[in-house]
Amino acid sequence: GESTHMTSWQVSGRDVFEAIAKTMIGRPVVGEYALEDMALDLERLLDRLSIRRAHVVGISMGGMIAQVFAAQCPNRAATLTSISSAVGNPRTGFGNLRAIAAVAMTGSDGNSAAQHYTHILRTLAGPQYPPSEAELTEAAKLKLAYDAEATRRQLIALLASGNRSRQVRELTAPTLVIHGRDDPLLPFKAGEETAALIRGAKLIAVDGLGHQLAPALMESYVRWIAEHCHAHPA
């Protein structure tokens, strides 16, 4: 995850912006791993836990991993819920530069990294769901071990997977797409595209929501996902 320590591989913010630039002009990006590898981790975890089928839910990059898992293991994804995510299409999946820079140009270790993480939360939040000071303080505590390089490695990993539109179009798992209309990192049109590509997918558009899991909407998230899963039992 974002806080995984792999100090032997140094990745700079410049590397991330170069990878983004390559994606924008259609050039391939090479990373140490890609979304497909991370989806394989999920498959192996389910094997280890002896779980044959699962309801797969992911937000942002996690949503992309969930999409890839549902494509690679169609018989094991009972449902798919893709939240604030995208399919890797550079025409729809890039938000504003300020949001991209906030994620790519992360802070250093310890307290400065935690402070920068609160900056990310403020930058990515939607106008109707700004994070409270209490939420920011708690998030900072949880991110004292935040690994900036891990975040940048993961950004390169998702760019290395390229445009997955064709793969996503072939998904058969019942799919729910949830996306904020004011997402500055992965624009709402990315969520619209995801839902349009998958046959029978349902799109829930949330006004005023950015690239975030807003605590004020937690009951709604639970209800939406529970209804989706209950409609398609594993």
Give names to the regions the model predicted.
Residues E36-A54:
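Conserved acidic catalytic loop of the alpha/beta-hydrolase fold
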Residues D182-L186:
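Acidic catalytic loop of the alpha/beta-hydrolase fold
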